[in-house]
């Protein structure tokens, strides 16, 4: 049983905490918050030991009547690994100023740059490369989703060229500061977007073979990808079969009512998923087509949750708990109640 510390109990951190708590080979020894908000109070109510991420703010929790066990410095030495859930750029600072200082292994999230850690993690592609490493970046929700679909395609044909248009959600549901509300925004306006190089950080063999562009649209539910991949040769049946065999990919039919991201989220609600999380990505079966060996398909990504099981697998890889990535994936999925 390994000890996991969650530094930053926010959108990602609280989900990773719940996922780790469901595993039988790891436990959450504590979570941190920078301020005494409702998430901090709920963490304590759920049974997590709460620590102040910033020592100077410990008194704020006490004044708010939220029990704290101490500060980050009081618990970090007990951790075998830290999962950093801090906002963009803060993760890198934590890595340099906290985790390396204390000599503790750490996972930073996809908001940081590839060069900030020893490698970039995806359960299907880079598990072995990250095995036993000390500092790893868990790639973003979009990159995670693309890595899964590229894995499926690559399992039946060589990828010659990949072109992806990303239609990104404007903000998470709890975000009142980000937009747009009434616009479509090229983000970035230049091509390629950062997503292609980010995929290459996980799949080096796609260097020079992947091109991405991205726009932001006024929705909060999910991202969507329109994928076009030139291959060495395949057909629709092979791709459908490959998607069915690839972990954490669901193939859904518009003919059964899955005609929008709203319906996919409703499906997650009906499954009883906490926070309506869909850790699996969803590919519309009707969108899958192959013309002259070029694969076309559309997929939806729940931006708050598809990276969560990857964090659990990354813990196992870095702490050398399981050498077989597929066994770790299966173990994680079963504990979290994933469909596949």
Swiss-Prot record:
Enzyme class: oxidoreductase
Pathway the protein acts in: Carbohydrate degradation; glycolysis; pyruvate from D-glyceraldehyde 3-phosphate: step 1/5
UniProt GO molecular function: 4-hydroxy-tetrahydrodipicolinate reductase; glyceraldehyde-3-phosphate dehydrogenase (NAD+) (phosphorylating) activity; glyceraldehyde-3-phosphate dehydrogenase (NADP+) (phosphorylating) activity; NAD binding; NADP binding
Record key words, sorted: Cytoplasm, Glycolysis, NAD, NADP, Oxidoreductase
Binding site for D-glyceraldehyde 3-phosphate: 140-142, 195-196
A Pfam family assignment: Gp_dh_C
Alphabetical list of SMART domains matching this protein: Gp_dh_N
Active site: 141
Binding annotation for NAD(+): 11-12, 111, 169, 303
Localization, UniProt: Cytoplasm
Main location: cytoplasm
E.C. designation(s): 1.2.1.59
Transmembrane segments: none
One GO cellular component, as annotated: cytoplasm
Catalytic activity, reaction form: D-glyceraldehyde 3-phosphate + phosphate + NADP(+) = (2R)-3-phospho-glyceroyl phosphate + NADPH + H(+); D-glyceraldehyde 3-phosphate + phosphate + NAD(+) = (2R)-3-phospho-glyceroyl phosphate + NADH + H(+)
PROSITE patterns: GAPDH
GO biological process: glycolytic process; lysine biosynthetic process via diaminopimelate
HAMAP family from the UniProt entry: G3P_dehdrog_arch
UniProt family annotation: Belongs to the glyceraldehyde-3-phosphate dehydrogenase family.
Assembly and interaction partners: Homotetramer.
Name the record gives this protein: Glyceraldehyde-3-phosphate dehydrogenase
Organism whose genome encodes this protein: Methanococcus maripaludis (strain C6 / ATCC BAA-1332)
């Amino acid at each position: 049983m390994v000890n996991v510390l969650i530094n930053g109990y926010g959108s990602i951190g609280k989900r990773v905490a719940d996922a780790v708590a469901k595993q039988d080979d790891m436990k959450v020894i504590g979570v941190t918050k920078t301020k005494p908000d409702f998430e901090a109070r709920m963490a304590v109510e759920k049974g997590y030991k709460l620590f102040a991420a910033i020592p100077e703010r410990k008194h704020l929790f006490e004044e708010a009547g939220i029990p704290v066990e101490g500060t980050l410095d009081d618990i970090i030495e007990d951790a075998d690994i830290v999962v950093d859930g801090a906002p963009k750029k803060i993760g890198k600072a934590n890595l340099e100023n906290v985790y390396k200082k204390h000599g503790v292994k750490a996972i930073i999230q996809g908001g940081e740059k590839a060069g900030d850690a020893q490698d970039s993690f995806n359960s299907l592609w880079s598990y072995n490369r990250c095995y036993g490493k000390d500092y790893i970046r868990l790639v973003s929700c979009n990159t995670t989703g693309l890595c899964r679909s590229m894995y499926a395609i690559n399992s039946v044909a060589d990828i010659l060229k990949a072109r992806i248009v990303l239609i990104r959600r404007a903000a998470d549901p709890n975000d009142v500061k980000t937009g747009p509300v009434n616009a479509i925004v090229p983000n970035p306006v230049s091509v390629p977007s950062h997503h292609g190089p980010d995929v290459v950080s996980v799949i080096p063999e796609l260097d020079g073979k992947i091109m991405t562009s991205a726009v932001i649209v006024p929705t909060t539910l999910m991202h969507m990808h329109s994928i076009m991949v030139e291959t060495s040769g395949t057909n629709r049946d092979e791709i459908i079969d490959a998607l069915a065999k690839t972990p954490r990919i669901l193939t859904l039919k518009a003919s059964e009512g899955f005609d929008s991201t709203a319906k996919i989220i409703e499906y997650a609600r009906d499954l009883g998923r906490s926070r309506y999380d869909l850790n699996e990505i969803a590919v519309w079966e009707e969108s899958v087509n192959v013309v002259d060996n070029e694969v076309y398909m559309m997929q939806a990504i729940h931006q708050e949750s598809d990276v969560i099981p990857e964090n659990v697998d990354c813990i196992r890889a870095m702490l050398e708990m399981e050498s077989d990535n597929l066994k770790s994936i299966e173990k994680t999925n079963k504990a979290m109640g994933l469909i596949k």
